[in-house]
Curated annotation (Swiss-Prot):
EC class: transferase
Gene: EEF2KMT
Lineage, uppermost ranks: Eukaryota, Metazoa, Chordata, Craniata, Vertebrata
Listed GO MF terms: protein-lysine N-methyltransferase activity
Entry keywords, A to Z: Acetylation, Cytoplasm, Methyltransferase, S-adenosyl-L-methionine, Transferase
Biological processes, Gene Ontology terms: peptidyl-lysine trimethylation
Cellular component annotations (GO), alphabetically ordered: cytoplasm; protein-containing complex
Reaction catalysed by this enzyme: L-lysyl-[protein] + 3 S-adenosyl-L-methionine = N(6),N(6),N(6)-trimethyl-L-lysyl-[protein] + 3 S-adenosyl-L-homocysteine + 3 H(+)
The UniProt record lists the keyword Thylakoid: no
Designated name of the protein: Protein-lysine N-methyltransferase EEF2KMT
Ligand binding (S-adenosyl-L-methionine): W139, G165, S166, G167, W238, A257
Function: Catalyzes the trimethylation of eukaryotic elongation factor 2 (EEF2) on 'Lys-525'.
Amino acid sequence: MAPEERADAARLLRGFERRFLAARALRSFPWQSLEEKLRDSSGSELLLDILQKTVKHPLCVKHPPSVKYSRSFLSELIRKHEAVHTEPLDELYQALAEVLTAEDPTHCHRSYLLPSGDSVTLCESTAIVSHGTTGLVTWNAALYLAEWAVENPAVFAHRMVLELGSGAGLTGLAICKTCRPRAYIFSDCHSHVLEQLRGNVLLNGFSLEPSIDTWAQHPGPHTPEAERPWVTVARLDWDTVTAPQLAAFQPDVVLAADVLYCPETVLSLVGVLRKLSTCRKDQRAPDAYIAFTVRNPETCQLFTTELGQAGIPWEEVPCHDQKLFPYEEHSEMAILKLTL
């Protein structure tokens, strides 16, 4: 195989690997490129490589995606092979047979590869809305914010980070694994989200402190040289939290991703941001970064209007260069930096 062909094959394999590990929509896979490769060669070796990068990947074996998803993926892979080659590939049918007999649980796993070679694995609900909340799955803006964070580790290095509406935990876990924060506080308000969030923190190898009080009592060992940040998960209801409760966190950086669902959440979020602006003992306001997908321009406009009325200046963060995670490429997303 010529060097250019090897490079093309490697890109194709990476495309399948990243999308399958993250359980992205099948329509987003590079099927057309695969069909071209299959027409130009016997294809058996390439398909076996794809199997090893997807359903046979060590991460998927240990933390499997949805059975339904694996079944659909393998069925599509077999269709592409059969459309070009009449000779069946036993390994494909064997892999499909294994998932056809498996039960599909209510939870599945998604994994995201980091530039360091490490990965973030999340256990998520198989339903977009489960237990009355959308916080049990990872949304596009969380991936977008995590990508930006990985490119800008200095924003978080050796600092205390508070994330509002952490959901499944993707953004925070990526930051904890790549940006060396001093401490990271995941927060949400829904009991099922908090339970899943704690599980994902542990799943990714972090110890979980019981509360912020343990940090206040024993901050010493968590020095900038520490390899692992101090991590906790906190229940934080934007509508009822008080300024003294927020002051206990003493954040240097505040984050939120995909939390602009409706006008009510916008008003609640701005209320929390106003309280956070005066929460630090040294009177230095934390840096704040809010990422969102532009689903409803009116809701986004309401957010910036409310920020203005609250006296919180903002600026849009320039788009980052590197796309690390697979998400909807046609989604319009933005990150605002707020001056609290």
